[in-house]
């Protein structure tokens, strides 16, 4: 079962990305290192509710 998730920057809190994940394979919150346009650098983005 795939669900839509929103990824927010851990430094500024801005929600920059929308993605999908499989809840069966990844039951915990996912984290990706992605580019944040507000900070102008790659930062850690964490799944939000």
Curated annotation (Swiss-Prot):
A GO BP annotation: translation
GO cellular component: cytoplasm; ribonucleoprotein complex; ribosome
Entry keyword Cytoplasm: no
Region described as Disordered: 20-49
Record's compositionally biased regions (Basic and acidic residues): 25-49
Highest taxon of the lineage: Bacteria
InterPro entries, per database record: Ribosomal_bL33, Ribosomal_bL33_CS, Ribosomal_bL33_sf, Ribosomal_zn-bd
UniProt xrefs under NCBIfam families: PRK00504.1 (NF001764), PRK00595.1 (NF001860), rpmG_bact (TIGR01023)
Subunit structure: Part of the 50S ribosomal subunit. Interacts with VmlR.
HAMAP family: Ribosomal_bL33 (MF_00294)
Family label: Belongs to the bacterial ribosomal protein bL33 family.
Name under which the protein is recorded: Large ribosomal subunit protein bL33A
Organism of origin: Bacillus subtilis (strain 168)
Lineage start: Bacteria, Bacillati, Bacillota, Bacilli, Bacillales
């Amino acid at each position: 079962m795939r669900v839509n998730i929103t990824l927010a920057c851990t430094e500024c809190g801005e929600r920059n990305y929308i993605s999908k994940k499989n809840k069966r394979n990844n039951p915990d919150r996912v984290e990706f290192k992605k580019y944040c346009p507000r900070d102008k650098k790659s930062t850690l983005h964490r799944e939000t509710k």
